A protein has these predicted regions:
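Bacterial N-terminal signal peptides that target proteins for export
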Residues: 1-11
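Hydrophobic faces of well-ordered beta-strands that scaffold small-molecule active sites
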Residues: 37-42, 69-71, 93-98, 122-124, ...
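Active-site acidic/histidine proton-transfer and metal-coordination neighborhood
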Residues: 26, 59, 67-68, 75, ...
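Bacterial N-terminal signal peptides
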Residues: 10-19
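Active-site beta-loop-alpha junctions enriched in small/polar residues
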Residues: 44-46, 72-74, 98-101, 127-129, ...
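Acidic/histidine-rich catalytic cores of soluble enzymes
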Residues: 155-249
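N-terminal pre-domain/capping segments
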Residues: 23-121, 215, 285, 289-292
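Aromatic-rich peripheral "rim/lid" segments of glycoside hydrolase catalytic domains that contact
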Residues: 242-244, 258, 262, 273-292
Length: 292
């Protein structure tokens, strides 16, 4: 202490209390003894609650406890303005998205956009196809598009990921069409984001899927599927099939244990229900309570 003086007990107590508060503030929302994260929020979760107001979305995400997001700048808003809004709130954008057409026809513009946003990851969540008829041809064409775009991302220091959406888990040979996409893409160019809800809704076992493809999975959408929900290959489901994490049919200890063993780098809660802002706190509490 200054001048060799002993600090009064009240000062020591204050220092200890301050350290406890600081440590609590540093702990990411939703993490705990078992699940370590890091955990962010997919901003699509807030579409029913804040409309098109970008500032309201960011503030709601922060209010819910998140400091990292997956999303993008609103249409018409310059990336620097959006990033400033995040920075002022102690937040950051980790991952952003692109539609398939842009990846195929103008991947350079997607790279430029991702760099402007400071995104470490870019994900694509849909391959165009006739509803309910995703085919081997669709899968092989997508693999070529992903490899070509993925090389550009790799050269820019960005990781490209394809986000599964349920329709890819139709049988094909000894596996599925999702397996085909994995096999037909180069690991150095293409990684994957497992959406646990859509993997299960498409008929896959999410934990076994992660164990099968291991380090190809870099990101995860932490999202639960209602017990009794229909399983199909359409890639569509009612909003109410998205329930709070821990209240649905997913075996989360098995999934998250497999994900941590595989080296998944970032997790994002996504909740598609109309009452997502009520469900997300429940999801966070469940994740904090997990031990495995």
């Amino acid at each position: 202490m200054l001048n060799g003086m002993k600090a009064p007990l009240c000062v020591i107590a204050a220092i200890i209390a301050g350290a406890v508060v600081a440590n609590a503030a540093e702990k990411a929302a939703g993490t705990g003894v078992g699940f370590k994260g890091p955990l962010g929020l997919q901003m699509y979760s807030l579409r029913f609650h804040t409309g098109t107001n970008a500032l309201a979305k960011i503030d709601k995400a922060r209010e819910l406890g998140f400091r990292a997001i997956e999303g993008g700048a609103p249409r018409g808003m310059p990336a620097p303005e959006f990033l400033k809004m995040l920075e002022q709130r102690g937040m950051k954008l980790v991952s952003t998205g692109s539609d398939y057409a842009r990846l195929k026809n103008d991947p350079d513009s997607v790279v430029a956009q991702a760099k402007a946003l400071g995104a470490k990851y870019v994900m694509c969540s849909w391959i165009p196809h006739e509803k309910g008829k995703f085919s081997e041809k669709n899968a092989r064409e997508a693999a070529q598009v992903f490899d070509a775009a993925g090389e550009k991302f790799r050269n820019a220091g960005i990781t490209f990921t394809y986000h599964c959406h349920g329709y890819e888990f139709q049988p094909h040979g000894d596996g599925t069409l999702f397996d085909l996409i994995v096999q037909e893409t180069k690991p150095e160019f293409v990684s994957f984001e497992i959406d646990v809800f859509w993997a299960a809704q498409g008929g896959a076992d999410p934990a076994k899927l992660i164990e099968k493809h291991g380090s190809r999975f870099k990101l995860m959408h932490v999202k639960d599927l209602r017990r009794g929900a229909a399983i199909n290959s359409t890639g569509t489901a009612p909003d109410e099939d998205s329930v709070a994490v821990g209240e649905g049919q997913i075996n989360w200890p098995a999934v998250l244990k497999a994900a941590q063993a595989a080296g998944v780098e970032y997790y994002f809660i996504e909740d598609e229900a109309k009452n997502a802002v009520e469900q997300i706190p429940k999801s966070l509490r469940y994740l904090e309570s997990l031990k495995f």
